[in-house]
């Protein structure tokens, strides 16, 4: 199905270009007896590269079409897509309307922090990956939303600020690679749960 959609979405100029390149391939074959082997190889390469780029374009378009079909199957639909496009806000669990970008960023902080806190610090590779993901989501959140008046008074914002402050306070005293004690983990998880209630 994706291939048919890809062909329907295929650019007419690319088809024209491909049709235009076919005679070049045939002309190269006709001139085969008159040219040296270097030019024969060049002509052959033109044909192969032209055909392969044509097929790659069709395949890529097919994959894009398949991905868009999967998104439609996931329940977004055309109406949902238009609503998402033109409505910058989203209703939270508590019924408030907040910017979608804020909610996405805050939810990512909650998710990555929770995963990081649940990882076993003795499994260094997994622990580092989850900690790095949490740091990155916090950086993104702070760079976009710290001090923003549209969200600064929200409960979720206050709870996430508490989480970030608790982490900063602990690591400034204990050092950047110190393991979090259970009481700090519990406090942070409680704040994350409270923040999630308002997202």
UniProtKB/Swiss-Prot annotation:
Disruption phenotype: A high chlorophyll fluorescence mutant. Impaired PSII function, maximum photochemical efficiency of PSII was decreased, about 25% PSII in thylakoids; severely reduced growth, decreased chlorophyll content. Inefficient processing of the D1 precursor to the mature form.
Keywords noted in UniProt: Chloroplast, Plastid, Thylakoid, Transit peptide
Subcellular location: Plastid, Chloroplast thylakoid lumen
One GO biological process term: photosystem II assembly
Keyword Thylakoid on entry: yes
A Pfam family hit: PSII_Pbs27
Subunit structure: Interacts with the C-terminus of both the precursor and mature form of D1.
Job of this protein: Required, but not essential, for D1 (psbA) precursor processing and thus correct photosystem II assembly (PSII).
Matching HAMAP family: PSII_Psb27 (MF_01481)
Family the entry assigns: Belongs to the Psb27 family.
Protein's name in the database: Photosystem II D1 precursor processing protein PSB27-H2, chloroplastic
Organism of provenance: Arabidopsis thaliana (Mouse-ear cress)
């Amino acid at each position: 199905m994706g291939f048919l959609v890809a062909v329907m979405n295929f650019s007419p100029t690319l088809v024209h270009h491909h049709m235009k390149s076919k005679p070049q391939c045939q002309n190269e074959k006709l001139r085969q007896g008159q040219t040296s082997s270097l030019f024969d190889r060049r002509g052959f390469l033109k044909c192969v590269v032209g055909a392969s780029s044509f097929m790659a374009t069709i395949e890529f378009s097919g994959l894009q079409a398949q991905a868009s079909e999967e998104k439609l199957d996931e329940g977004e639909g055309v109406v949902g897509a238009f609503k998402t496009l033109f409505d910058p806000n989203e209703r939270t669990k508590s019924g408030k309307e907040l910017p979608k970008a804020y909610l996405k960023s805050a939810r990512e902080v909650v998710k990555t922090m929770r995963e990081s806190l649940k990882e076993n610090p003795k499994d260094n590779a997994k622990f580092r990956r989850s900690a790095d993901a949490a740091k990155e989501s916090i950086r993104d959140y702070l760079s976009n939303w710290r001090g923003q008046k549209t969200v600064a008074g929200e409960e979720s914002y206050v709870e996430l600020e508490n989480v970030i402050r608790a982490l900063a306070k602990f690591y400034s005293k204990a050092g950047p690679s110190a393991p979090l004690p259970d009481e700090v983990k519990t406090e942070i998880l409680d704040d994350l749960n409270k923040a999630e209630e308002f997202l």
